């Protein structure tokens, strides 16, 4: 990776072991030919009063608008909705916990932003729930996303910007 996009620098996040170029603060940044837009959103369900604010990232790459909301847990204001709306690809946390959207919250954000492709993150894969982890699996999110088809993938996949699967959720199995 050439750089790291992080949502926050909390003690359990934003780890940068190789001291790579890392973007974490809200703002507009340019890396080579990619313009990164970091938008501040609550990192909790209390308007940021518990865990502060997180950074949600949006950028264009290969003619695709990409939004990454892995570190968001709170509501997004109307200005952020306008900036983030209609991405080709939306990465969004769905597993719940104290610092990320649960399946109900994530499905509401998807309905507001209207992405073509959704890639869920921050959830427990499979049916096994780990006692020491406050994430759940993606079942609740998928239950709320009846208008989307679901495709299960291996470790990687390619997207053709000229032929995007509309209303599709991609879930990585590994």
Where do the PLM segments sit?
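Conserved strand-to-helix beginnings and helix N-cap segments that scaffold or border functional pockets
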Residues: 78-80, 102-104, 131-135
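Ligand-binding grooves and catalytic loops that recognize ribose/phosphate and carbohydrate rings
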Residues: 9-28, 109-113, 130-149
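Core dinuclear metal-dependent hydrolase active-site scaffold
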Residues: 3, 10-12, 18-85, 89, ...
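Binuclear metal-ion centers of metallo-dependent hydrolases, dominated by the metallo-beta-lactamase
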Residues: 50-51, 117-174
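Short amphipathic alpha-helical segments and helix-helix/interface helices
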Residues: 56, 80-84, 106-110, 138-142
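Proline-aspartate-enriched helix->loop->beta-strand connector
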Residues: 1, 86-89, 99, 103-123
């Amino acid at each position: 990776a050439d750089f790291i996009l992080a949502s926050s620098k909390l003690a359990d996040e934003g780890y940068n072991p190789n001291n790579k170029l890392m973007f974490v603060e809200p703002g507009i940044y340019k890396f080579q030919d990619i313009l990164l837009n970091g938008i501040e959103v609550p990192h909790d369900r209390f308007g940021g009063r518990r865990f502060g604010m997180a950074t949600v990232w949006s950028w264009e790459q290969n003619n695709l608008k990409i939004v990454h909301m892995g570190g968001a847990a709170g509501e997004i204001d109307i200005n952020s909705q306008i900036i983030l709306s209609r991405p080709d690809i939306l990465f969004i946390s769905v597993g719940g916990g104290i610092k990320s959207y649960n399946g109900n919250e994530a499905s509401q954000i998807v309905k507001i932003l209207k992405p073509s492709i959704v890639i869920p993150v921050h959830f427990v894969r499979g049916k096994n729930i780990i006692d020491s982890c406050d994430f759940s699996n993606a079942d609740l999110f998928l239950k709320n996303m009846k208008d989307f088809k679901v495709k299960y993938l291996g470790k990687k996949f390619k997207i053709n910007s000229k032929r995007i699967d509309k209303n599709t959720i991609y879930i990585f199995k590994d």
